[in-house]
UniProtKB/Swiss-Prot annotation:
NCBIfam families attached to this UniProt entry: rpsB_bact
Chain intervals with Polar residues compositional bias: 255-264
Source organism per UniProt: Deinococcus geothermalis (strain DSM 11300 / CIP 105573 / AG-3a)
Region (Disordered): 243-264
The name this protein goes by in its record: Small ribosomal subunit protein uS2
Organism superkingdom: Bacteria
One of the GO BP terms on file: translation
GO molecular function, one term: structural constituent of ribosome
Keywords linked to the UniProt accession: Ribonucleoprotein, Ribosomal protein
InterPro entries: Ribosomal_uS2 (IPR001865), Ribosomal_uS2_bac/mit/plastid (IPR005706), Ribosomal_uS2_CS (IPR018130), Ribosomal_uS2_flav_dom_sf (IPR023591)
A GO CC term assigned to this protein in UniProt: cytosolic small ribosomal subunit
Length: 264
């Protein structure tokens, strides 16, 4: 029995690909037909790939593996954050910072800085600073929280990454490929299957499609672990998901994260 039924895939519109002018020829083997200028994805092949990909996720979760959830496009942000937090997994829903994987040591220094700022504000020590400095520190804290808050408990490189739209998240995929970290992806007809280790061919734009696949992955992880467990080892209730909608971040480099200028 498949993890997801054909009926569920059809109802969520997983079979609708991009316009025929937007496609990657390497994806051809997963395309069923063309209808009115739109590619139709072969859901029989999607089901087979779901079984293969979800078997891997289930096995990895049972072994205590860490999966980094990545989804920065607007329609994926809230869903990805919700499922990552429900399962206790790290996530990126603002812009992917170059080097998040390949230069993880530097990224960890930014996380350490965020923890330092949190301590300053929570302890009240920040009140000893001049007002202008407090404002700058608050802005820095907010930026760091937006860009690295979802990975703050990730003390090592993940065992795999799950990506919604690998074409948009090309840098994340490239970094994972370079380090030999398996890539699991919900990938549409404009994607290159050759850079994805575990592909779920399907609509990566429609909210219902993204939600179906991502939520089922979340269920698998929770079921495999008997409840979520975050990367710091604290238990996470599957129902404890007090999530605010993810904000649409801006692309920045590490220097901008500590700058007092820019978006806050």
């Amino acid at each position: 029995m498949s993890y997801i039924s054909m009926k569920q895939l059809l109802e969520a519109g997983v079979h609708f690909g991009h316009e025929t002018k937007r496609w990657n020829p390497k994806f051809k083997r997963f395309i069923f037909a063309e209808r009115n200028g739109i590619f139709i994805i072969d859901l029989q092949k999607t089901l087979k790939q779901i079984d293969r990909s979800f078997d891997y996720i289930k096995d990895l979760a049972e072994r205590g593996g860490v999966i980094l959830f990545v989804g920065t496009k607007k329609q994926a942000q809230e869903i990805v954050e919700l499922e990552a937090r429900r399962t206790g997994m790290p996530y990126v829903t603002s812009r992917w910072l170059g080097g998040m994987l390949t230069n993880f040591r530097t990224i960890r220094t930014r996380i350490d800085r965020l923890n330092e700022l949190d301590d300053m504000f929570e302890s009240g020590r920040v009140n000893d600073r001049p007002k202008a400095e407090r404002i700058e520190l608050a802005a820095e804290r907010e930026r760091l929280l937006r860009f690295v808050g979802g990975i703050r408990k990730m003390t090592r490189l993940p065992d795999a990454i799950f990506v919604v739209d690998p074409t948009k998240e090309v840098i994340a995929v490239q970094e994972a490929n370079k380090l030999g970290i398996p890539v699991i992806a919900l990938a549409d007809t404009d994607s290159d299957p050759d850079v994805i280790d575990y592909i779920v061919p399907g609509n990566d734009d429609a909210i219902r499609s993204i939600q179906l696949i991502t939520h089922r992955i979340g269920d698998l992880i929770v079921e495999a672990r008997g409840g979520g467990e975050d990367v710091s080892g604290e238990r996470v209730s599957p129902d404890n998901a007090d999530i605010e909608a993810a904000e649409d971040g801006e692309e920045v480099d590490n220097a901008q994260l500590t700058s007092s200028q820019g978006r806050s």
